[in-house]
Amino acid sequence: MSITIADDIRDWSINVLEVSNPDLPGGMSACPFARKAWLDDQVRIVECEDVLMQTILECGHFDPDQASLVICASYNLPDATELYDWTSAMNAFASKADIHVMSFHPDFGAEEAELDFLYLNEWQSSLEEPYCMMFIQSLSQVDDASLLLEDKGYYSVYPEDEYHELVIERRKRRNGYETS
């Protein structure tokens, strides 16, 4: 039986995102909400050829009551800089529909962002070929979760520029840029 991208993502979540992490305050996990989302069957993974087109399609019918997280994943890698720019543009548009999109590209990741807690681990992908991912979630749900994490000091390990880009800018989009 061959391993799918979905299998690999689930393995990554179990072994990296859901486990206690000594680099985070109080040993929190890298993604404190991941385990519950999986247990509640709130994660849907779509393996596709064109990750950008599939993300647009998934955003068009995204329903957080059906799945709080949709992951579009593909072996067909767009250029890393283009993916980053596309994600920023998509969020400017999608925020009006309470949708937030995050991207992962194997050529640009946690190491460049100095997010040690995401890459200093023993996990290895079971797949030989790299893949990219687009994460689709409710903007308000992600922002509400980040408020809870802020209270617990979660973002204290983030470099200031990453915190601003990942948390503050997202919050500004949610609030129509009324948040300073």
Which stretches of residues belong to each language-model region?
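Expand to "…catalyze enediolate/carbanion chemistry for C-C bond making/breaking, isomerization
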Residues: M1-S180
